[in-house]
Amino acid sequence: MGCFECCIKCLGGVPYASLLATILCFSGVALFCGCGHVALTKVERIVQLYFSNNASDHVLLTDVIQMMHYVIYGVASFSFLYGIILLAEGFYTTSAVKEIHGEFKTTVCGRCISGMSVFLTYLLGIAWLGVFGFSAVPAFIYYNMWSACQTISSPPVNLTTVIEEICVDVRQYGIIPWNASPGKACGSTLTTICNTSEFDLSYHLFIVACAGAGATVIALLIYMMATTYNFAVLKFKSREDCCTKF
């Protein structure tokens, strides 16, 4: 066998679907964790400066943000490790299915690992779908604030409300308790918040974090299809003495 044929045979064992999913997963997790971490820090500062004068009112928010920072560290570490494991499993199953190294060979342990990877990937897909929905919440809150600021800076002709009565109350979102003071920002104060670099940066970071979570969901969907297909073929070929290739 020549060098060219050997290279073609080796390239045939590359799990391109798993490789694409791994790159997409790493990118999505990096965007979600990195942008989410910085955005949460900016949220804490905005609340302390403009919505809560008493430190005891936002102490719970501070603790929650600190806890979410640690959760982000754990999610990033686990996702990167699991992505590498799935990529390695993809190389194993692709080589076995395509019989790269001779006739079809697999073990009960190998099929068990493939089945477990399918199960875990489905669970992670559902979990990340929830994370994607959850990450859209702060982006929605920021969009409401931005829309209110746009109304203040460029009021429509048919506006009947006084500019100073246009407010955003973060207490209704559960960010701080109802007895927090002032708890809301109105008129010129709200415009000042929207013009700060913290608001602009955190708004865009939350959008990017949401997009990163969406990319991770897509990556896990690709993983689901690849691992399910590989597991089905392994199970089929281990039971039947056939030469059919899908």
Curated annotation (Swiss-Prot):
It is found in: Membrane. One of its GO terms (molecular function) is structural constituent of myelin sheath. Highly expressed in white matter in myelinating shark brain. Keywords: Membrane, Transmembrane, Transmembrane helix. It is a multi-pass membrane protein. Its main location: membrane. The chain crosses the membrane at residues 19-35, 71-87, 118-134, 206-222. Pfam families: Myelin_PLP (PF01275). InterPro entries: Myelin_PLP (IPR001614), Myelin_PLP_CS (IPR018237). GO terms for cellular component: membrane raft; myelin sheath; plasma membrane. GO terms for biological process: axon development; central nervous system myelination; negative regulation of serotonin uptake. Belongs to the myelin proteolipid protein family. PANTHER family: MYELIN PROTEOLIPID (PTHR11683), NEURONAL MEMBRANE GLYCOPROTEIN M6-B (PTHR11683:SF10). This is Proteolipid protein DM gamma. It comes from Squalus acanthias. The lineage of its organism: Eukaryota, Metazoa, Chordata, Craniata, Vertebrata.
